[in-house]
């Protein structure tokens, strides 16, 4: 109860800070928006049964933007004092005087703003007990070591707890807030046999502490993952079907988010520039953005400009439905904001209601990719090339681990080549998706 009271007091302080900033801004004869984000948390790190680190953190920022007619000035600070706020407003207005006039800048249209924040069940405080957190982290390691003698070392076990408070206001009368919690636990272990040594990790992430994977199960899963990579082999260069496992498939669709972001669209720096309302995925595939998903990791009632978020289709029957727009790039494109200032919310990628095992059988022979490396994706032309590790699949069953491969292609072709998506949805990211089977891709090995 003490923690809840402290958070409520901090929230009240931040709301009053925004109110005071807006009150002071009435003297500068300009449109103003104010945003405060404050995160309070604690992290415990254990390695080989020894506490390596206990870290308390409190990080936040006050962001002020003024629009002096069509000229913009922005400032930020960690100092929330009245004296500093006055100084920030002076600096922001001075910056705007030296900024070039831009017809597309300005506050959102009032009809798009959020005046009543929706309750999304994001706040689940936990009275953090350091001793219990240490015990939970040690238990993850202990269960990993005990599960198999081939587990020989640990790279650490973590437990994190964070609370974030967001407050937004502007000179059009908006003053809204919401708070959220986020918990995570993580374990990374090293396995060794006569011929090789491999590492792997596992983790969970949730809004409620009780929804995290149990420490002993986390340790066992991590150990199993590390052991499964022992004896990794190299393979020949080939063209092959592949499956992106559900733990990494969100990355595959994150490139879509980049390609349809408003900045890339109005700058014509995306390969999808001419594809709005065009088919770019199989006709059975939908992607819904739901910012109002209860306890969702990407849920929020309003975006970073105070625009109310809404449920919408990104992809419907394989067809691209919308760009991802903030107010500025929306005006550039003569469109309306989609409430995506600050990024995407919860993307729910449809699947074909088949199990992961059925997906393996459907592929029959090919590569299961479980980890990707590098940043070799060019949104301008859609070219894709990334390092990967995973498993060779034979007759619909995982046969042996593989490493040191590169997969390459073009995103447009890769999206069109999606054969099926299984129902093993990973909910630890803003993009929730099952494992994805592609009919064919270039694989470079030996």
Swiss-Prot record:
The keyword Protease applies. It holds the Pfam family PmbA_TldD_2nd. The keyword Ribosomal protein does not apply. GO terms for biological process: proteolysis. PANTHER family: METALLOPROTEASE PMBA. Probable metalloprotease. This is Metalloprotease PmbA homolog. It comes from Buchnera aphidicola subsp. Acyrthosiphon pisum (strain APS). The gene is pmbA.
